[in-house]
């Protein structure tokens, strides 16, 4: 009696499902292509022509990130078309703060059992994020790993490469005392602080994924799955006409941890509380969770997605430009000298 034949599909890896998924995403991927893209989907590597003649001394800037436990909300809501935007945003926002134009993006999707329709929703979000950022989705990896993830769950990661002229790199070294700090508004929690947010909303407040939020017109899933704002086009527009001395992407660590990453030694950032419009979700979380102020500002973006350090003379023009580009922006602080006994580089007043 012959033994039954073992197959890859029987072991949990469905190559046919993978092929179906590739066909579904081909038009999505192609919608992101720039003229520099030299390959079609399905090759071993993605080719992108740098066209170095356009630049004097180009420097490549790379970034990689994920979406974290925000994915848990996508699983609960069974909505998967927004987390791809988050993925792109977390990567491209990290490199545009150094003055780099994002050129291309690659993604990684891992799951226990591939659902081609669900995976296509994820890639649709990634493609939308790439279009918003102006970068091409030139490659990716989809890993089906039986037994590795809970049923219906997945993880995603992204990687982006951009370019900036060497003499136009923004690293904060030109920030000086007296520079003003402009905050660009966030769309909500973005992609950070979700472990604490979930604990407060589901455990402390006892809400369900589709429950209305207090002091809001949104339900829990509508608020918490709002995509991270992508600032690439607005920042690149500013850089054409204004000198920006430093830019901080306010992600995990909030204002308290991210702004010091761009401040020169001896400088501190003083932020005036109440100088910007804070989305109600942050007040809801703070009150329901009885969270201390510093914990809030070290965990969440508190309504500010990016902080720009600029000359005082440019503040009004930059605010006007940002508003014209559809951004909410405010003068929220100033760069000051650290006092002799001062230990923290960020002060909330």
Curated annotation (Swiss-Prot):
Organism: Trichlorobacter lovleyi (strain ATCC BAA-1151 / DSM 17278 / SZ) (Geobacter lovleyi)
A GO BP annotation: 'de novo' IMP biosynthetic process
EC number: 6.3.3.1
Pathway: Purine metabolism; IMP biosynthesis via de novo pathway; 5-amino-1-(5-phospho-D-ribosyl)imidazole from N(2)-formyl-N(1)-(5-phospho-D-ribosyl)glycinamide: step 2/2
Reaction(s) the record says it catalyses: 2-formamido-N(1)-(5-O-phospho-beta-D-ribosyl)acetamidine + ATP = 5-amino-1-(5-phospho-beta-D-ribosyl)imidazole + ADP + phosphate + H(+)
First-level EC class: ligase
Gene Ontology MF annotations: ATP binding; phosphoribosylamine-glycine ligase activity; phosphoribosylformylglycinamidine cyclo-ligase activity
Name of the molecule in the record: Phosphoribosylformylglycinamidine cyclo-ligase
Keyword Nucleotide-binding: yes
Keywords: ATP-binding, Cytoplasm, Ligase, Nucleotide-binding, Purine biosynthesis
InterPro entries, alphabetized: PurM-like_C_dom, PurM-like_C_sf, PurM-like_N, PurM-like_N_sf, PurM_cligase
GO cellular component, as recorded: cytosol
Subcellular location: Cytoplasm
A Pfam family it matches: AIRS_C
Record CDD domains: PurM (cd02196)
Annotated Gene3D superfamilies: PurM-like C-terminal domain (3.90.650.10), PurM-like, N-terminal domain (3.30.1330.10)
Family from the record: Belongs to the AIR synthase family.
């Amino acid at each position: 009696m012959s033994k039954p034949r073992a197959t890859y599909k029987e072991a949990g890896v469905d190559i046919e499902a993978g092929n179906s998924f590739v066909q579904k995403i081909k038009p999505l991927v192609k919608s992101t292509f720039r003229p520099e893209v030299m390959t079609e989907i399905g090759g071993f590597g993605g080719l992108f022509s740098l066209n170095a003649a356009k630049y004097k001394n180009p420097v490549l800037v790379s970034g990689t990130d994920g979406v974290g436990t925000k994915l848990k909300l996508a699983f609960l809501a069974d909505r998967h078309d927004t987390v791809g935007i988050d993925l792109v945003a977390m990567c491209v926002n990290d490199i545009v703060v150094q003055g780099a134009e994002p050129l291309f993006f690659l993604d990684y999707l891992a799951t226990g059992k591939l659902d081609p329709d669900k995976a296509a929703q994820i890639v649709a979000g990634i493609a939308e994020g790439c279009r918003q950022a102006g970068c091409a989705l030139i490659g990716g990896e989809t890993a089906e790993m039986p037994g590795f993830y809970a049923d219906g769950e997945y993880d995603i990661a992204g990687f982006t490469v951009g370019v900036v002229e060497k003499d136009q790199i923004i690293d904060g070294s030109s920030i000086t005392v007296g520079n003003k700090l402009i905050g660009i508004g966030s769309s909500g929690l973005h992609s950070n602080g979700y472990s604490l947010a979930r604990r407060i909303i589901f455990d402390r407040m006892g809400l369900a994924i589709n429950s209305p939020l207090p002091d809001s017109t949104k339900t829990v899933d509508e608020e918490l799955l709002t995509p991270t704002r992508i600032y690439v086009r607005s920042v690149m527009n500013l850089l054409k006409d204004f000198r920006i001395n430093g830019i901080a992407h306010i992600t995990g660590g909030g204002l308290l941890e991210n702004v010091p990453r761009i401040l020169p030694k001896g400088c501190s950032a003083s932020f005036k509380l109440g100088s910007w419009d804070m989305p109600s979700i942050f007040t809801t979380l703070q009150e329901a969770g009885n969270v201390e102020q510093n914990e809030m500002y070290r965990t969440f973006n508190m309504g500010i997605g990016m902080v720009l350090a600029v000359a005082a003379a440019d503040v009004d023009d930059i605010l006007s430009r940002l508003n014209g580009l559809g951004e909410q922006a405010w003068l929220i602080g100033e760069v000051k000298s650290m006092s002799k006994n001062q230990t923290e580089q960020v002060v909330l007043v």
